[in-house]
């Protein structure tokens, strides 16, 4: 039976060095190969021209180099770009370039489909097929960086893990990808320009704090009332708000980093005074800011955007206690690239 080869880009630099030592070669070969894989973007071992042919053959026998392919690219009227990204096994994920006047942001995926079941999100309708490898996450970012340079004449300025999947359920691979992006071999981007958005898994938020991560944390909250939140995000029954609160307090004690709350206001769901009051109370637990996000429909109309009056009620109440509030008007809606709309429509093509 043929043994499936491992993607070499899943190895760290130290693991590559150890591999060469274990195979009676010099440790510095690991540095050479690592540079080819990440800084130079080698797509095959034959590309590694300063590596001996016998060494390349040994790598070929033990590993593969899996790269993504941008199958389709759509540009929105507002300049947003959505990529349908084909993986080595034929599965598809989506990633988005979001431009503004001052910066370009990559919205990247961490899973094929999603492990969770948020009722308002198109991705949740896709069962989770698998986690993305570090290289697959990194390649999404590099593809968007190229598009940023092409269309906007400057490199990518920010990254948000708000695409397909729950990043904290693919934690190790997401961390490896972030480490590569922030390294000299990658984009050399400051971790402060990277935001990981989670639906709120308390034990993993605590783990991030213990790991002393330097990137920013956003939580998809959508309600500070357990019963309401469970209707919006059924999985949250397993993670009550008191546990989330405790984890966020722990996060702030360890990191001193503010939390961002992502919050959509829906008609008849969380647009009442009790919901506003509950969020105001929740925002007092740790220093935070709130992003009120325009809702993006996913065909069936079950969830409807609340009135401007309802949104203004949230803004007024939060600003009264000194919380910074931003209203996020979604971009890329005409190409299904906005928040909650990523759903692999290209996968069937």
From Swiss-Prot:
Residues 100-334 form the Radical SAM core domain. S-adenosyl-L-methionine binds at residues 165-166, 197, 220-222, 296. Binds 1 [4Fe-4S] cluster. The cluster is coordinated with 3 cysteines and an exchangeable S-adenosyl-L-methionine. The keyword 4Fe-4S applies. It catalyses: adenosine(2503) in 23S rRNA + 2 reduced [2Fe-2S]-[ferredoxin] + 2 S-adenosyl-L-methionine = 2-methyladenosine(2503) in 23S rRNA + 5'-deoxyadenosine + L-methionine + 2 oxidized [2Fe-2S]-[ferredoxin] + S-adenosyl-L-homocysteine; adenosine(37) in tRNA + 2 reduced [2Fe-2S]-[ferredoxin] + 2 S-adenosyl-L-methionine = 2-methyladenosine(37) in tRNA + 5'-deoxyadenosine + L-methionine + 2 oxidized [2Fe-2S]-[ferredoxin] + S-adenosyl-L-homocysteine. The active site is at residues 94, 339. Reaction proceeds by a ping-pong mechanism involving intermediate methylation of a conserved cysteine residue. This is Probable dual-specificity RNA methyltransferase RlmN. Disulfide bonds join 107-339.
